[in-house]
Amino acid sequence: MQRKLLPLALLILPLAACASSGEPRGSSGFSARANVGYGKTSDGSFDPSGSSASGEYSPGMMSGAAIGYDINERWGVEADWTYRSGDIDSIGTGGSVANSGDYASVAVTGNVIHSFATDSPWRPYIGAGLGFLQEIDADLKPSGAEVSDRGALAYQFLAGVGYRASDSIEITLEGRYLGAEDVELTGEGQSFEAEYEHVGVMLGFRWLF
């Protein structure tokens, strides 16, 4: 999955260069953002076909990018791509399904952002989004099986604060919650129905142009 970060970097960097060399903009205009963070998949059901089990997970890294448009000083929209990763501690009683492994997802969402105007460089904001899991996969150990799903409906809520470091650069810190419905992980003759909820914190750099 991490190889998919390269096209996003190639897209964001030229936009950032344009932003840094441009004139100061008003309250509306386009933006590009790059994020890194840390988060955890919530423990929950990870049910084999015809049975039930629960999964326990450890935190992992997050990374992502977004292209947005500020309609005015209060409202904006963005297309967001975020990669989330973490470790599997156990699935099933005593790790009967898996006692280690990796669990990761790529989510694509369209977000609506509401900002609270202040007479300072600080910009508190909240947002909500709807989209899908471009990919979610679990590598189960010690069996070595890999199961995955694509296209599951996903929804997102976020809240954060931005600091306007210059006319064209804003630094953001935000918390995010992502949930997904009807995740069905299949592969190598195995099938699972899983809950997927993830909570994380991300640091971002947003270029305004």
Give the positions of each predicted feature.
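Short sequence motifs at beta-strands and strand-loop junctions characteristic
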Residues: 55-61, 100-107, 149-154, 193-197
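A broad helix-preferring feature
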Residues: 15, 154-156, 200-202
